[in-house]
């Protein structure tokens, strides 16, 4: 079933849903650059105003995956992505990137999908570059990195080249659109398990159900009630969990895991170098809030990766990975491996 762009726009004005096949068609037009900038802007703004449905988001993610440069990973067991939507305005250091090293050190395979900072002071790509990682890898090189080190970073512009067809429109609009929530749904390596942070509480239930439709295995979508797109130490965290095809929504608290509730204010950074310093301090087992929040998030990721039977068990594994020095060693391992591909 096809729909004209004008019909789709009218549908959004009337707050009516664009059906799955129609959304597939529309999204392909956008990704190919077949819509005028005016029409593309009108449609994605209309979707935002009426509020995108689970079906519309799932269809859009399906098309983004179609257009991606895929990373072929041979062994899908214990394979996880740790990612946030960003846009939470918290300006903290790169917690999910730090968690990647801990999660890999504890035995999971991590395919991290990220970009440079837009609303944040330091995106995952920025801090990895500050650490000395070569982020400009081709798909086969990322696959080799995952196989060799247990970690691979997929720099979004290298894996979603069709996004250039909507980039100028998004930049000029300057407001959140459906594309702000598609990134975490479109991992080019197809990681079946995921820890996903979101910038709004309503997205917890939406994103986990989108992942359910997309056939994911074990996913935890989280929103810290202090506004963080991470599992928070400063407040309760809302969780939407997909496991065995079923969705459960609940809250967790730092105290549930023997952790103290503390403010996240000390985690703020101004740039990638400050983020690098805080990340390395946490991985060097320096006591403090940074180490504890990395332990909490890595523990949750280890549960998502099915390495741990619970978040509590995952936290214990994360503590051991940091205390043993294995997590810190993973940084040097990734730097060494990726630098061989420097162009």
Swiss-Prot record:
5-phospho-alpha-D-ribose 1-diphosphate binds at residues 84, 87-88, 92, 94-97, 112-120, 124. Its EC number is 2.4.2.18. Its cofactor is Mg(2+). This is Anthranilate phosphoribosyltransferase. Catalyzes the transfer of the phosphoribosyl group of 5-phosphorylribose-1-pyrophosphate (PRPP) to anthranilate to yield N-(5'-phosphoribosyl)-anthranilate (PRA). The keyword Metal-binding applies. GO terms for cellular component: cytosol. The keyword Transmembrane helix does not apply. InterPro entries: Anthranilate_Pribosyl_Tfrase, Glycosyl_Trfase_fam3, Glycosyl_Trfase_fam3_N_dom, Glycosyl_Trfase_fam3_N_dom_sf, Nuc_phospho_transferase. Keywords: Amino-acid biosynthesis, Aromatic amino acid biosynthesis, Glycosyltransferase, Magnesium, Metal-binding, Transferase, Tryptophan biosynthesis. It comes from Burkholderia orbicola (strain MC0-3). GO terms for molecular function: anthranilate phosphoribosyltransferase activity; magnesium ion binding. Homodimer.
């Amino acid at each position: 079933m096809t729909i004209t762009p004008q019909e789709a726009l009218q549908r959004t004005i009337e707050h009516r849903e664009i059906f799955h096949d129609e959304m597939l068609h529309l999204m392909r037009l956008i990704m190919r650059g077949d819509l005028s900038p005016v029409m593309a802007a009108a449609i994605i703004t209309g979707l935002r105003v009426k509020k995108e449905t689970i079906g519309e988001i799932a269809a859009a993610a399906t098309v983004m995956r179609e257009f991606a440069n895929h990373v072929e990973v041979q062994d899908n067991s214990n394979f996880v992505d740790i990612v946030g939507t960003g846009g939470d305005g918290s300006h903290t250091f790169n917690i999910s990137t730090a968690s990647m090293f801990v999660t890999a050190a504890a035995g999971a395979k991590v395919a991290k999908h990220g970009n440079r900072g837009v609303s944040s002071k330091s995106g995952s790509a920025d801090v990895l570059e500050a650490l000395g990682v070569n982020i400009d890898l081709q798909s086969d090189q990322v696959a080799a990195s995952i196989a060799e080190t247990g970690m691979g970073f997929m720099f979004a512009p290298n894996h979603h080249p069709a996004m250039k067809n909507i980039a100028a429109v998004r930049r000029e609009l300057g407001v959140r659109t459906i594309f702000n929530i598609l990134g975490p749904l479109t991992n080019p390596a197809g990681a079946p398990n995921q820890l996903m942070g979101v910038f709004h509480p309503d997205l917890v239930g939406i994103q986990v159900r989108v992942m359910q439709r997309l056939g994911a295995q074990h996913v935890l979508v989280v929103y810290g009630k202090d506004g963080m797109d991470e599992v928070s130490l400063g407040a309760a965290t809302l969780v939407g969990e997909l496991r065995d095809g079923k969705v459960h929504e609940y809250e967790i608290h730092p105290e549930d895991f023997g952790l103290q509730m503390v403010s996240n204010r000390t985690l703020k950074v101004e740039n990638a170098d400050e983020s690098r310093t805080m990340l390395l301090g946490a991985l060097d087992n320096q006591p403090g809030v940074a180490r504890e929040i990395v332990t909490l998030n890595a523990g949750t990721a280890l549960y998502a990766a099915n390495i741990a039977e619970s978040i509590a068990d995952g936290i214990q594994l994360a503590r051991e990975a940091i205390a043993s020095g294995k997590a810190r060693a993973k940084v040097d391992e990734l730097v060494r491996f990726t630098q061989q591909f420097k162009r």
